[in-house]
Amino acid sequence: MSKILTFVKNKIIDLIKNDQIKYSRVITIEESDSLLSVNEVYANHGFDCVEMIDENIINENLEQYKTDSFLQ
């Protein structure tokens, strides 16, 4: 068991040293609220994407954002 753990540890260290694993800091909801002037911010942790939702948008205004490949 010790050999397996040592192997995994060394493999992870090698991947980090060779820049095959990148670290990306995830901003928390509290930090986002202080940086952005939006009503609500949802962070998808583990991915570099933040979805901002403005609840004041009327449905008619959403038509301009629809595409053929999305929302149909």
Curated annotation (Swiss-Prot):
Highest taxon of source: Viruses
Keyword line: Early protein
Induction trigger: Expressed in the early phase of the viral replicative cycle.
Family: Belongs to the orthopoxvirus OPG050 family.
Protein name: Protein OPG050
Organism: Variola virus (isolate Human/India/Ind3/1967) (VARV)
